[in-house]
Amino acid sequence: MKKFLLASALAVSAISFAQIGFSSTRFGIIAGGNYSGVKNAHNPSGPRFAFQGGVLALIPIGSENQFFLQPEVTYYGAGETGKDKDAKGVDGYNAVYANNYLSVPIYFKGYFSEAASEFFGMAGPRFNFLMSQNVKNVPVIRPYYDPDFQDPLYPNVNGKASKFNFGLGIGIGYSYKRQLELAARYDFGISNTYPGLDKEPKGTTKSKSEQVLSVTLSYIFN
């Protein structure tokens, strides 16, 4: 948490001293696929495939056509399933633990040169606000994975997802004429997605953080 706050403070300080060209902001749309999982949460545990899509802004930093801020507002599917490749036929294999967010990442984006078509890298924080949680087919022996179920034996244990979480994202991509862009990203979850599972019987107190690998395609308007 301290590292995250320090990184955010440094980013804000850097931005405050940079020449940000809000008047030259361009807007665009973005869509892609997510491959997500949650560490230390469910058993069995496997990946979930989901969708993301929304809008973005490209805000110049400095006079060169090379460095930008790219905030986004997207629908962002994450969570996981029970489809562990080594758990076929096991109770809970068909479970779904879907978390759907309104997500707001803020990337620092740098193209490798000022050329019209060029590779780029990006990094920055991501803030997720839970819109809905869809859970089904939980293991019979772990009914508390269902956020609507309260086990009288373990009243403090539940599978409710946090209303808010955050992480750090990195990515690399290619831009065709600074309009059509393809990118691969990885979001490292930092906060605890399922604090109610920290006291799970025979579970772990390690943070249940979401990790998301995604591929996105965006179009930026002139």
Features from the language model and the residues they span:
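Outer-membrane beta-barrel "beta-signal"
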Residues: 30, 207-222
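Extracellular loop and loop/strand-boundary signature of outer-membrane beta-barrel proteins
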Residues: 39-44, 89-95, 154-158, 199-205
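Glycine- and aromatic-enriched membrane insertion/assembly motifs of diderm outer-membrane
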Residues: 25-28, 35-37, 44-92
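Membrane-embedded beta-strand positions of outer-membrane beta-barrel proteins
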Residues: 29-31, 69-73, 106, 121-123, ...
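Transmembrane beta-strands of outer-membrane beta-barrel pores
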Residues: 33-37, 75-79, 100, 110-112, ...
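Transmembrane beta-barrel domains of outer membrane proteins
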Residues: 56-60, 107-111, 171-175, 218-220
